[in-house]
């Protein structure tokens, strides 16, 4: 997905470089490509939001500003971590409050969420059998709260594809970007 996005303008590229520098990541040139953050589903709310006791550490939300925040296996994230997305999605900024300081960082990102229909991944899949009790399915999908779902503009159900089908698509990111 980030390969489809346009290059960053000067102001956004500078913001991205500043946030990377704050996060302790190397900044040798002003990158024009949008950032892409894909935290692991075990990431805590602090890993998403950021923090630090003495030195500010931008989290994945701020590091994705100007680009894409991809949450794969979103149903596996804690509800607390997912709820941390609500305020930045609404306001376009992230506020970090710690003893002795308050920081406001940009948080204008495209959120892409992928999740299975249930913990085993087979619910509703033709030819597969779901082994999950209905309570487990409700609990799993319940981690995506109503207020968070309200901030997701496009919802798309997909069927499984084989590795051969995925590779056979034949459209490069560059070609798709030209069409966009």
Where do the model's predicted regions map?
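Walker A/P-loop
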Residues: 1-28, 91
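Conserved AAA+ ATPase core "coupling" helix
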Residues: 15-17, 107, 122-180
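Inter-Walker segment of RecA-like/P-loop motor cores
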Residues: 29-50
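AAA+/SF3 P-loop NTPase mechanochemical coupling elements
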Residues: 36-37, 56, 60-66, 96-117, ...
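Walker B catalytic acidic pair
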Residues: 66, 72-74, 84-85
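A short beta-strand-to-loop transition that corresponds to the Sensor-1 phosphate-sensing loop
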Residues: 72-74, 99-100, 113-118, 135-136, ...
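Conserved D-loop-proximal element of ABC-family nucleotide-binding domains
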Residues: 78-80
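Conserved catalytic/switch belt of AAA+ P-loop NTPases
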Residues: 82-103
């Amino acid at each position: 997905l980030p390969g489809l996005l346009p290059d960053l303008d000067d102001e956004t590229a500078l913001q991205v470089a500043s946030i990377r520098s704050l996060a302790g990541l190397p900044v040798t040139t002003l990158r024009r490509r949008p950032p892409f953050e894909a935290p692991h589903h075990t990431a805590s709310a602090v890993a998403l939001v950021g923090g630090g006791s003495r030195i500010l550490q931008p989290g994945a939300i701020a590091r994705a500003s100007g680009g894409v925040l991809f949450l794969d296996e979103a149903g596996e994230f804690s509800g607390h971590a997912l709820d941390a997305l609500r305020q930045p999605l609404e306001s376009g900024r992230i506020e970090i409050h710690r003893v002795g300081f308050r920081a406001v960082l940009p948080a204008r990102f495209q959120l892409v969420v992928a999740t299975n229909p249930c913990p085993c991944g087979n619910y509703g899949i033709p030819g597969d059998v779901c082994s999950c009790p209905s309570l487990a399915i409700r609990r799993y999908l319940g981690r995506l709260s109503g207020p968070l779902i309200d901030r997701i503009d496009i919802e798309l159900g997909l069927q499984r594809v084989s590795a051969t089908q995925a590779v056979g698509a034949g459209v490069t990111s560059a070609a798709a970007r030209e069409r966009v």
